[in-house]
Amino acid sequence: MARSIWKGPFVDGYLIKKVQKLMESGKSEMIKTWSRRSTILPIFVGFTFSVHNGNKFIPVSVNEEMVGRKLGEFAPTRTFHGHGADKKIKRK
């Protein structure tokens, strides 16, 4: 079920503070975060976030198409190594 519109998008408060601080200073640093649950806001466009995937931090550079989605959607947590090979021996 989707989040109620009257509640608005969820974003951790410290993320907004970090983005505003970087906007004021004019620096383009990578913002390190564990908050995969935060929604991407329009003020995040142009910034690069390091999103934790449970093992390491994945760099995610935000563009306009990402607005409204979650940060965690762009840092996959599982790696697919392919399906197992067929172990049956084929006879001629």
From Swiss-Prot:
Keywords: Ribonucleoprotein, Ribosomal protein, RNA-binding, rRNA-binding. HAMAP family: Ribosomal_uS19. Protein S19 forms a complex with S13 that binds strongly to the 16S ribosomal RNA. SUPFAM superfamilies: Ribosomal protein S19 (SSF54570). This is Small ribosomal subunit protein uS19. GO terms for biological process: ribosomal small subunit assembly; translation. GO terms for molecular function: rRNA binding; structural constituent of ribosome. It comes from the Bacteria. Belongs to the universal ribosomal protein uS19 family. The lineage of its organism: Bacteria, Pseudomonadati, Pseudomonadota, Alphaproteobacteria, Rickettsiales. GO terms for cellular component: cytoplasm; small ribosomal subunit. InterPro entries: Ribosomal_uS19, Ribosomal_uS19_bac-type, Ribosomal_uS19_CS, Ribosomal_uS19_SF.
